Amino acid sequence: MHIYRTGQDITVLNDHLEAPGIGFLPANAFVLHAREPVVVDTGLGLPDRDFVRALASVIDPADIRWIWLTHPDRDHTGGLFDLLDAAPLARVVTTFLGVGILSTERPLPLDRVYLLNPGQSLDVGDRRLHAFRPPLYDSPATVGFYDDRTRTCFTSDCFGAPLPTADLARTGDARDIPADELRAAQLLWANVDSPWVHIVNTGQYLQTVRSIQHLDPDVILSTHLPPAIGLTTQLLDTLAQAPGADPFTGPDQQALEQMLAAFQPAAPA
């Protein structure tokens, strides 16, 4: 796991996954060093990852007060229950639907839950975190937030981009990605993660894009993109094009078999 600071108040815990035929997808969690510290998502649920151990290199888990779960997919909840054990004062910020989805894997203690809906806000001591639903998402439980002190939007899956190399997936600045490559990757991800974008009312969809524009964030932090500093206009312009981008169709069984055959060692002569 690649761990680094972005700005004064935020630590990025960066991981990534390779999706064959798509690219290297960043998988970020964050620590917001507020007066009441907030962990945003809890990493991948793979057996060789130890999210709590990595997190402990950044902050004592006993000091954590909030775990903001942007949605309950496994690339966001990998360390959740271990972190609840290690951080006895922390409460999980999620929605009613989020609790329901999580409970299909393991019961979530309701005294450790704080239900928050889009449009509401959370006081974390020295700032308020304003909850919103991002324009693009793959889960009805998705809730991002805007930190009015650092002028940062935490957007969950929205604005994600599978990248051509692992090094780019690890970079600490989305400006390292050429603009045309970033645009193409974000449009691909929009159609992988939110295929419904092709069937919604375009005018109403663009209103949700403008809602981010009205916040005018300096930084956009997506789970699946390196930190985007000073790129808000560029990223919103790309998001506005998502309904007209090519729909994504994944490999079928024949393509999978061809892919697996390519991995087989050549027969001896």
Question: Residue ranges of each PLM-predicted region?
Answer:
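Conserved beta-strand hairpin/beta-sheet module of binuclear metal-dependent hydrolase folds
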Residues: 1-55, 144-147, 151-155
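Metallo-beta-lactamase
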Residues: 5, 93-222, 227-232, 241-243
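Short, flexible loop segments at the rims of nucleotide/cofactor-binding pockets, characterized by
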Residues: 15-21, 43-45, 68-71, 129-135, ...
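Active-site neighborhood of phospho(di)ester-bond hydrolases with catalytic His/Asp-centered motifs
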Residues: 40-42, 64-72, 92-96, 153-156, ...
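Short, glycine/acidic-enriched loop or turn micro-motifs at the edges of active sites
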Residues: 44-45, 74, 160, 227
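Active-site metal-binding motif and surrounding structural segment of the metallo-beta-lactamase
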Residues: 47-93
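C-terminal regulatory/interaction regions
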Residues: 229-269
